[in-house]
């Protein structure tokens, strides 16, 4: 025992020196100095005496774990994807470069960076210098990850990193196809220059809302926790590959900052996390950050439009993009990108640019330069009022909601996303036109998008003195709640933030009110609001940290809870169904579904068959009473409606199709989820629990193909299935940085997962370690205090370099 105490004491002295000695060991003014301790799972605890040195440490250590993804994100932000990687599948690299350049993101970066505060400039510059130090010391040819030897991995500038922030914040780069395809009808030469894939309304809506980036967020106040202090669950659903992965870190400036959490790769600071007094998470908002405008064109001049009866010219920005061919030679490709005074012109299959009308878009984040300011203010806040003031002052979160809790037991929700501020008259007129104008109605009723009359100035955004970006809704008019019980969000609008007391009366640009919610929102609502003795919070109806964790990992399928018994009852009435001329025996399927426990755990038999059944329906059916549900949505009972099986015959036909899929895949009808759903991490195939939105589960595991040059495991799609491949369900998206936090009398206590691991380097031990923990639902402790860090220290070092 004495020996162990001695070793721990020695470690504590080392850590105390590293984490708290900056003032005594202050570096010369011309030198960066950051002290880094790594604990289990590769988590860095970085201490510095100013933001420049803090960024220096962040940049170097982030490069150790993710040099390839950071380098790739900078290539994207520079508009150089086609230069290094060719035009890309369906010209996506070329289109991305054109739009990023046309928006002026890299061209304006120097001016925009110079307008940042001195502290921000120091932080960003320090980060780039830390990253560059890693590149110089290791050398591109000695990188052990997937970009080894790549000519696009090179030193970067502060302006490059600032461009990366702008690409993250703005919406237009995500919908490059609809912008590049917008050409005047007479411009035949330019129209033939680039083949643009047809984008459907649904695909457009997904890209605009970043809807593939989902999340759950729960915050509990003093009335709903066992100890009367705040609790938080952060559960962002983000990519497991590419540049939108999270990276975990602990940042310390003694006497000023002590923040633990995660941010997207290549970004300084913490976006989701906690300090001694405040903890928060984000979910992607359901708001309309972009609105569309229909322009009435001047006869004979399709590049001029009427505005309050007067003609106004569009502008063309001719882009010259360097493109690497398959033989390695580089050529130049030119094309014009067109703009109205609102923003880029756009084109859609059902709304092309004609001689009479054209569409344009306005992005509420086009002038948003204060993202780093807001997250920094949130990181530094020491009470909930200061945290809310960060939102009020900066008003800069581009597309997320915030759920926050505090040591004194407050639960706060803010939809701080940027949306345009329309007058009440404009809103009323637009609402009328959703009924009277077919295209306006199609935009809204089909996909929930806003189309306005761009030739009428009354649809301009209205200024407010508190708005940081002219024309956006200020903090005072954003949906928000400050409560002592709970709030939550699962990517639907603000309306059902609290089950018993919904939020009403906000701009429709923040999303619908008194409308059907997703099945995922509904299961989240049940988990957080249930205070019954047998509910997730136990007999007292108040959560402990473990109970909150278990609620998420209960992996309940609300869809199964609502429909499984009725499907089983229906299938017991028949022996077979004819599908596409084939008689399909349902006896085995009926038996398998009888044994399904309505959860999505690894040992849940019948879960795969049920998934294949529910995904035979269109996802939109899960919101209404039509083909799937019998009872309609009721605004007075939003958690429990719609419900009931609508059409037994269709249900059995879809069950037969699911049986066919299982047979083609070579899977038994009673296969468990663990036999079919995997993450491939290098040579490891790891079974993981969780499910898709249609299954009505909180713990999301999904399949997406993302922006990266790294290898991604792919399989051949099984005929008749939306997701199943010959390699199973290949998880590449879902639960990412999972944070469970409880404030106690002794400070914050947290446990977490970074589900895909801290490192993107396949040779690192931290490439698969946390995925295996997640598979077994084994939460790991977060090391926040000096004592805990000392006990778990795996390495320590001091990083220095010349200050820029």
Regions found by a protein language model. Give the residues of each.
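C-terminal motif of bacterial Sec signal peptides marking the signal peptidase cleavage site
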Residues: 19-21
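Substrate-recognition/specificity elements adjacent to catalytic centers across diverse enzyme folds
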Residues: 28-243, 250-256, 260-263, 269, ...
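Bacterial N-terminal signal peptides that target proteins for export
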Residues: 1-9
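Proteins synthesized as precursors that undergo proteolytic processing into mature forms
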Residues: 373-399, 504-569
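Glycine- and hydrophobic-rich flexible loops that cap the catalytic core of alpha/beta enzyme folds
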Residues: 261-263, 273-277, 282-446
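Acidic, low-complexity N-terminal propeptides/linkers enriched in Ser/Thr/Asp/Gly that mediate export
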Residues: 120-240, 406-471, 475, 480, ...
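Second-shell loop/turn segments in exported
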Residues: 57, 106-122, 360-362, 372-378, ...
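Bacterial N-terminal signal peptides
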Residues: 9-17
